[in-house]
Amino acid sequence: MKVNKESMLVYAITDRHWTGEKTLEQQVDEVLKNGATFLQIREKNMPHDELVKEAVLIKEIAKKYNVPVVIDDDIYAVIESGVDGVHIGQKDMDYIEARKLLGDDKIIGMTAPSVELAKKAEKLGADYIGAGAVFNTSTKKDTKYAPAIRHQPKRYLVSEKSIFNLREDYYSRFFQEK
């Protein structure tokens, strides 16, 4: 499954620490049932073998909704679980090596927190580009968010492959014209 404009409308990212009483699978099913069109499994502290098992279960749930699934950082978990692709950051495996391992049929998304890095990611062939956090976030302590993007978002949209991580309560403020 490849990325298209429709699949990038609502990009959901997992974090099992926020699921409350529900299992990760229950939470994923609910999110996809309610309209998420793309899913990233981002479980930073989950052991590799457990991540692969979770990814296999989540892949089956996503298949019901025809939603692509990528795993954050762990290319080998992608290969072992058979999910649709990987999302890599600037400090992860480089794009060329990732593409060699995954082949042309898998999705590779990249984080690019600047216009320069986004253009580089697009030139390399990334299927989509994430700008990262545009506001401070409690879910990613080491983030260097990009406040300039929130003041002129249209200026920073390098291409239709660009995405931003926005909480719902920030969305309307973010896209208001200045």
Question: How would you name each of these model-derived features?
Answer:
Residues M1-M93, K100-D127, S172:
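Conserved N-terminal beta1-alpha1 strand-loop-helix module at the mouth
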